[in-house]
Amino acid sequence: MIINAKGPASFAEKYIVRSIWENKFPPGSILPAERELSELIGVTRTTLREVLQRLARDGWLKIQHGKPTRVNNFWETSGLNILETIADLNPEGFPVLVDQLLSARTNVSAIYFRGALRNNPDTAMEVLAQIHQLEDTAESFAEYDYLLHHTLAFSSGNPLYVLILNGFKGLYSRVGRYYFSSSEARQLALNFYKELELLAKAKNYLDVPALMRTYGINSGKMWLQLRDDMPSSIAQQDSH
């Protein structure tokens, strides 16, 4: 098992998570005893204990006082915070994960975009006005796109959408920089922003879902053209 890590705790965490992912520690199984596991990984028991607590908080493990540590089925017990980890563990499946991420984001954003234009059209107009000074670079578009989503999610009347977006943030920012490196993708997005601005000015929230659906289809087609050339390094958490 080849693991790139910045220190003993990082190594131990990646070792255990990869072992769970590769079914060496399958869901429902009991982890080896602390002393045995610390010797196996090559870290102190204190370091291991801290790592186990962190993995339990993320849903990978179940720790109960006086009982052995049990491996969870992370698909049932973890949240969006493990998206980065899954991308790291499964680079071959990363393009599919991104497809699923973008699909989920498109579906959810249709709800909070509509909510924002309905409940806070002035805030929507304010953030959309920034498109007229937007630099034609991948970095600027990726940053603005996240800002737009974050602002409208917060203005939708349901701030829980912001927490969902936060779970996507690291992964989406890397994918976004790659996606918006295409001038066609930037133009497609700019046209969408302009149409959304017109709806905001007209306080027309009813037509938002149709606009989102059209942009979702068109940007999805654009993504399919780009994804096969996506650098594998984008899957890595430290990629910039």
Swiss-Prot record:
Q: Which UniProt keywords apply?
A: Activator, Cytoplasm, DNA-binding, Fatty acid metabolism, Lipid metabolism, Repressor, Transcription, Transcription regulation
UniProt xrefs under CDD domains: WHTH_GntR
PROSITE patterns xref list? HTH_GNTR
The entry's DNA-binding region feature spans: 34-53
Q: Which GO terms describe its molecular function?
A: DNA binding; DNA-binding transcription factor activity; fatty-acyl-CoA binding
InterPro entries associated with the record = FA-response_TF_FadR, FadR_C, TF_FadR/GntR_C, Tscrpt_reg_HTH_GntR, WH-like_DNA-bd_sf, WH_DNA-bd_sf
Q: Which SUPFAM superfamilies match?
A: GntR ligand-binding domain-like (SSF48008), Winged helix' DNA-binding domain (SSF46785)
Domain (HTH gntR-type) spans 6-74
GO CC term (a single one): cytoplasm
Cellular localisation:
Cytoplasm
Tell me the superkingdom of the source. Bacteria
Might you name a Gene Ontology BP term for this protein? regulation of fatty acid metabolic process
Q: Give the disulfide map.
A: none
**SMART domains per the UniProt record, alphabetical:** HTH_GNTR
Q: Mainly localized where?
A: cytoplasm
Q: Which HAMAP family match?
A: HTH_FadR
Q: What does this protein do?
A: Multifunctional regulator of fatty acid metabolism.
Concerning PANTHER family, the annotation shows: FATTY ACID METABOLISM REGULATOR PROTEIN (PTHR43537:SF52), TRANSCRIPTIONAL REGULATOR, GNTR FAMILY (PTHR43537)
How this chain assembles, per its entry, is:
Homodimer.
Name-wise, this protein is Fatty acid metabolism regulator protein
Q: What is the lineage of its organism?
A: Bacteria, Pseudomonadati, Pseudomonadota, Gammaproteobacteria, Alteromonadales
